[in-house]
UniProtKB/Swiss-Prot annotation:
Organism of provenance: Mus musculus
Main location as per UniProt: endoplasmic reticulum
TM annotation in the entry: 75-95, 114-134, 142-162, 176-196, 218-238, 257-277, 301-321, 345-365, 376-396, 406-426, 510-530
PANTHER family in alphabetical order: ACETYL-COENZYME A TRANSPORTER 1, SOLUTE CARRIER FAMILY 33 ACETYL-COA TRANSPORTER -RELATED
Domain of life: Eukaryota
Region (Disordered): 1-58
Family per record: Belongs to the SLC33A transporter family.
Induction description: Expression is induced in presence of ceramide.
Catalytic activity: acetyl-CoA(in) = acetyl-CoA(out)
Tissue specificity annotation: Expressed in all adult tissues examined including brain, heart, kidney, liver and spleen, with maximum expression in liver and kidney.
Quaternary structure, from the entry: Homodimerizes.
Residue intervals annotated with topology Cytoplasmic: 1-74, 135-141, 197-217, 278-300, 366-375, 427-509
Protein's name in the database: Acetyl-coenzyme A transporter 1
Length: 550
């Protein structure tokens, strides 16, 4: 189904191209690190300082609050940087739908799903990004500029190779391994850019206006994701363009993936050059110095947090809590494409979801603001599990309503309503987990603590989706019809069946088997482990405080 336009780390992580994908938890930047090096003049370390605009030193006179208009250029720059960040995320999210239209195996789809992991794993290299930099160039620009240059150059080069990788030349099969490596690098670079931009946002704006950073983040990445996914899939589709945008039909869409990559690669190079030359970072020695922490100390701190009994219990439970949703979230959208639903129509269904996705967190937060936010998670879980079965029924029903190669309006209305109900349950669980993570995080090390909990929450959605995709093919039973004494258990057997005049027919679709198994596992978790998960709310504050050896 349509990709969810989601909060980023999201992968938003939000996983696009699926019927619905896990929301990535927003994780704030880690405490800036110091890198002890003899070349302090050239590489930032403990002696460097970043401006937090609006801070005043002890001897300074208080200044009048800054209007957002006085920093409009910085706000617009942040917004544009987040838009650029959303482009590779959206493009990566469109590839599964394109691959599915080319009839690749679900094993290949599972392999490609590793592309969506970097945003959930960026905690592993965030301390490095925060600590190592060139002082004279700027703490954030030291990573932002080379990262975006690499993205731009890579996009332009890929524009010359993507048709071959997708199998558009000479009817070859898509090179899934090369596509996975390529877009994994895209996501890795986008996650690195996210770390740098999040950190820069805190010092680019004054304290009065720093709240606009989260708005730029949400709006910018959503817009970029929309451009790279929904808009691209629509303009790339010959059927969509011929039906809605052209007077004379053409055999291809208005844009191709290679055109799109070349255009945005050029935009990345031009804008990055302008940022490198024209935008300066705030580095006044008189401003209060940020708390810094060494790279090694940061990793030691993370390990100390994980070893705490309460945190370890949370990690184990949250890593298994989303198994029940994996078939519905990861496979349903691809199954709809397999049944003939145009991928661009599924992508466009994300558009009416945007207002709902904005309103839902505001409404749900009223119920998660109390001392027991996980109650909402527990109450929403069975409804989301039942919607997984409804998704399976929707896939089963899809070929029965197809008419002359298309689908009636009422079909899309039912799909949209199903999607909206799913979003209500998904956001209820997402917001409650975010509220719980914020509630238990040790305020003395809030950035690192919160990021760790959110990272584990993201991984709890990533690995079940990958496994769910991987298991579809092994659970599917196919029979060779028209050729005696043949089967369709392996690719070679399928080829032999066709050569002997037969055809492989699906007797039992692994998606339905998996949907039932996942729901049973999900209800088992809800019944046996759910109460233990809720009991974590009863742990005292001391259970969540990390003892640090200074």
């Amino acid at each position: 189904m349509s990709p969810t336009i989601s909060h980023k780390d999201s992968s938003r992580q939000r996983r696009s191209g699926m019927f619905s994908h896990a929301l990535d938890m927003k994780s704030g930047p880690l405490p800036p690190g110091g890198w002890d090096d003899s070349r302090r003049d050239s590489v930032g370390g403990e002696g460097d300082r970043e401006v937090l605009l609006g801070d005043a030193g002890p001897g300074d006179l208080p200044k009048a609050p800054r209007s957002y208009r006085s920093e409009l250029s910085s706000i617009l720059l942040l917004l544009f940087l987040y838009v650029l960040q959303g482009i590779p995320l959206g493009l990566a999210g469109s590839i599964p739908l394109i691959l599915q239209s080319k009839n690749v195996s679900y094993t290949d789809q599972a392999f490609f799903s590793f592309v969506f992991w970097p945003f959930s794993l960026k905690l592993l290299w965030a301390p490095l990004v925060d600590a190592v930099y060139f002082k004279n160039f700027g703490r954030r620009k030291s990573w932002l500029v080379p990262t975006q240059y690499t993205l731009g150059i890579f996009m332009i080069y890929l524009s010359t190779q993507v048709d071959r990788l997708l199998g558009n030349i000479d009817g070859r099969t898509p090179d899934v391994v090369a596509l996975t490596v390529t877009f994994f690098l895209f996501e890795f670079l986008a996650a690195t850019q996210d770390i740098a931009v999040d950190g820069w946002a805190l010092t680019m704006l004054s304290r009065e206006n720093v709240g606009y950073a989260s708005t730029c983040n949400s709006v910018g990445q959503t817009a970029g994701y929309f451009l790279g996914n929904v808009l691209f899939l629509a303009l790339e589709s010959a059927d969509f363009c011929n039906k809605y945008l052209r007077f004379q039909p053409q055999p291809r869409g208005i844009v191709t993936l290679s055109d799109f990559l070349f255009f945005w690669g050029t935009v990345f190079l031009i804008t990055t050059t302008l940022v490198a030359l024209l935008k300066k970072e705030n580095r006044e020695a008189s401003i209060v110095k940020e708390e810094t922490q060494g790279i090694t100390d940061t990793y030691k701190l993370l390990f100390s947090i994980i070893k705490m009994p309460a945190v370890l219990a949370f990690c184990l439970l949250i890593l298994t809590s989303k198994i029940g949703f994996s078939a519905a979230d990861a496979v349903t959208g691809l199954k709809l494409v397999e049944e003939g639903v145009p991928k661009e129509h599924l992508a466009l269904l994300a558009v009416p979801m945007v207002p709902l996705q904005i309103i839902l967190p505001l409404l749900i937060s009223k119920y998660t603001a109390g001392p027991q936010p996980l109650n909402i998670f527990y109450k929403a879980m069975p409804y989301r599990l039942l919607l997984g079965l409804e998704y399976a029924l929707l896939v089963w029903w899809t070929p029965k309503v197809e008419h002359q190669g298309g689908f009636p309006l009422y079909y899309y209305i039912i799909v949209l309503l199903s999607y909206a109900l799913h979003q209500v349950t998904l956001y209820s669980m997402y917001v409650s987990i975010m509220a719980f993570n914020a509630k238990v995080s040790d305020p003395l090390i809030g950035g690192t603590y919160m990021t760790l909990l959110n990272t584990v929450s993201n991984l709890g959605g990533n690995w079940p989706s990958t496994v769910a995709l991987w298991l579809v093919d092994p659970l599917t039973v196919k029979e060779c019809v028209g050729a005696s004494n043949q089967n369709c258990r392996t690719p070679d057997a399928i080829e032999l069946c066709k050569k002997l005049g037969g055809s492989c027919v699906t007797a039992l679709d692994g998606y339905y088997v998996e949907s039932i198994i996942c729901v049973l596992i999900g209800f088992g978790w809800w019944f046996f482990l759910g109460p233990k998960f809720k009991k974590l709310q009863d742990e005292g504050p001391s259970s969540w405080k990390c003892k640090r050896n200074n």
